Amino acid sequence: MDCGFCTVIAGALNNFTSSLEEEEENYEKMNRYHPLIRYQLGFHAEYTISEELLTGLAKLAARYRAPVYTHNSETAREVEECRLRHKTTPTVYLDSLGLFEYGGGGYHCVHMSREDLRIFQEKKLYAVT
């Protein structure tokens, strides 16, 4: 396909419709397809994916030295529910699993703490709003 503009596709790994194997297959296949097409590792959101899949995705990101993208802190409820599950914010939790070692970013990022912002700055993460 020759479209003449750059396209970036981010993965949406989750507990329901995809697997680590599919994520890796998409990453390898699409990043070889055309120089103007890039595939970035990603998952839907902290609340739609298991810690086991997140840990696997962090290993995949390390293998490819690749950034990871996700929906992050879109609503106050999302952040509060993450605090109940993991005793911290989505950003801190995901960073603790090694997901941002090679950069990446979050979509929305509306309800961020000072610590979240520090992590975004330190890891050079992007906020896509």
How would you describe each model-predicted region?
Residues 2-110:
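Metal-coordinating catalytic core of metallo-dependent amide/deamination hydrolases
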Residues 99-129:
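Active-site-adjacent C-terminal substructures of enzyme catalytic domains
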